[in-house]
From Swiss-Prot:
This is Co-chaperonin GroES. SUPFAM superfamilies: GroES-like (SSF50129). Together with the chaperonin GroEL, plays an essential role in assisting protein folding. The GroEL-GroES system forms a nano-cage that allows encapsulation of the non-native substrate proteins and provides a physical environment optimized to promote and accelerate protein folding. GroES binds to the apical surface of the GroEL ring, thereby capping the opening of the GroEL channel. NCBIfam families: PRK00364.3-3. CDD domains: cpn10. PANTHER family: 10 KDA HEAT SHOCK PROTEIN (PTHR10772), CO-CHAPERONIN GROES (PTHR10772:SF58). Belongs to the GroES chaperonin family. It is found in: Cytoplasm. Heptamer of 7 subunits arranged in a ring. Interacts with the chaperonin GroEL. InterPro entries: Chaperonin_GroES, Chaperonin_GroES_sf, GroES-like_sf. GO terms for biological process: chaperone cofactor-dependent protein refolding. GO terms for molecular function: ATP binding; metal ion binding; protein folding chaperone; protein-folding chaperone binding; unfolded protein binding. One of its GO terms (cellular component) is cytoplasm.
C-alpha cells in the first residue's frame, strides 16, 4: 500500500530510542509511553519543501497523527511540526 501525504505533510517512521540505566539495564522508549522525537521520512508531499524521503527529522514529542499501514505504525506530521533535519 502506498501513502501519499497531502498539503504540507510528511509520513515518518518513528525511531525507537533505547535508554540504558547506570547499572546496564536497557529501557526501551515505549516503556515510558512517550513518543520518540526523531524519525525517518518515508513519504513527503510536493508542498513539503526542505525535507526529502530518507531524511532523519526531529519533531515535538506529541506532534502529528499516528496511523497504521501494513501492520507498521507511522506518524503523519505537518511540516511546521518538524523542528529540523539531521544531516
Amino acid at each position: 500500500m502506498k501513502f501519499e501525504p497531502l498539503g504540507k505533510r510528511v509520513l515518518v517512521e518513528r525511531e525507537e530510542e533505547v535508554k540504558t540505566t547506570a547499572s546496564g539495564i536497557i529501557i526501551p522508549d515505549n516503556a515510558s509511553k512517550e513518543k520518540p522525537s526523531k524519525g525517518k521520512v518515508v513519504a513527503a508531499s510536493k508542498e513539503a519543501e526542505g525535507v526529502s524521503v530518507g531524511d532523519i527529522v526531529v519533531f515535538a514529542k506529541y506532534a502529528g497523527s499516528e496511523i497504521s499501514l501494513e501492520d507498521k505504525k507511522y506518524l503523519v506530521l505537518n511540516l511546521e511540526d518538524i523542528l529540523g533535519v539531521i544531516k
